[in-house]
Amino acid sequence: YTTLRVRGTDPSRINITSNGVPQSDAESSQLFWVNMADFASNLQSMQIQRGVGTSTNGTGAFGATINMLTENIGTKPYVGLDLSAGSYYSHKQTVRFSSGLLNEHWGIQGRLSNIGSKGYLDRAFTKLNSYFLQAGYFGDNTVVKFITWNNQEQTYHAWNYTSKYEQSMYGRSYNSCGYMGKDDNGNMMFFDNQTDNYHQQNYQLVWNQRLNSALNFNVTGHYTRGDGYYEQYKRNKPLINWGLSTNPDEKGNVIEQKKLGNDFYGAIASLNYSADKLSATFGGGWNKYDGDHFGKVVGKPNYEYYRNNAKKTDYNVYGKASYEFLEGMSAFVDLQYRHVNYTMQDPTDSYGSNADGKYIIDDDFNFFNPKFGINYDFLPGQRLYISYAIA
């Protein structure tokens, strides 16, 4: 729906970073790309490493590692407008600008985008608005950048499976999400606001320092704020699910809102050495997630049928090195220690479960992740490698 797979790997097994900062959600270990609208317009590169990747920050990576690097501010000023349109009223408008380098050291760059579509499936519209802004100082040995991007999305639910029977009865574009029953004339009715709504704001402060021709370090602080909810119509369901009745047999129609508000912040750093046949990196990071989940029933503004809080603290240190011991043949070693503390407090959205509010999860995890390998470039464009890794 809004996920990316690598060789069929579940998205929760893929580690995704931007400028080395963890981008995957700390709880689900997934990145929902609908919250990154038009981010590709500001990328310098995207590196995808299949399998267990080298040590990085954020969630564990069993299937792949993806690192996105945002583009540099160019030396020349420009203003650009990109317009595109397609089937099902799909459209994209992007305005871009850059100051170029001011006084040979300063610059600012930005983008404003609007993306939308009515969708192939019935009512499956998409409304995405986003911006990207960066400003910084660029010296011979020092680069300091402030980067921020924002995304506001609204999408109609379209994640239900459509059976062959439903397609034969109602057409290939049939979407059962939001079904409310039939009116007096036998026409199907659907809930207009069966939507997902989310706002996400990202901030990064990046410092790159070159110490000499072989040595440099990078330090990045980051903060992400997310707020949103999805609303859905529940038809003829037991009211006890929302605490609206004590009778398990009493049923009714309910419009529920499941809401989320979260903060994710931390810092990462690395020291890098590269000279002759040896390259090495020592680094690590500390990150914390603090999220509130709560549910409301439309029509009862002061009523919450659940609220819980989850916190996740994650820190790691790693060292990795590669050495070319023969022409075209190199060996690498990569060692990482990672610690995770995860707590969650009830009640959950299963009404009445552990309603005393005790922590139902309070666990610490420690991981040691070694990786070793040999790489042999025996012909131009031909490479043989073997590796062993634990993630």
Placement of each model-derived feature along the sequence:
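Face-selective signature of the C-terminal outer-membrane beta-barrel domain
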Residues: 197-352, 364, 370, 375-381, ...
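Short acidic/polar hinge/loop motifs at secondary-structure boundaries
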Residues: 3-5, 22-50, 69, 166
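Extracytoplasmic loops and strand-loop junctions of Gram-negative outer membrane beta-barrel proteins
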Residues: 28-29, 48-49, 77-80, 114-118, ...
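Transmembrane beta-strands of outer-membrane beta-barrel pores
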Residues: 83-89, 101, 114-118, 139-141, ...
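Transmembrane beta-barrel wall of Gram-negative outer-membrane proteins
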Residues: 85-116, 121-158, 203-213
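Outer-envelope beta-barrel architecture signal
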Residues: 14, 75-79, 91-93, 102-108, ...
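A beta-strand signature from Gram-negative outer-membrane beta-barrel systems
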Residues: 37-80
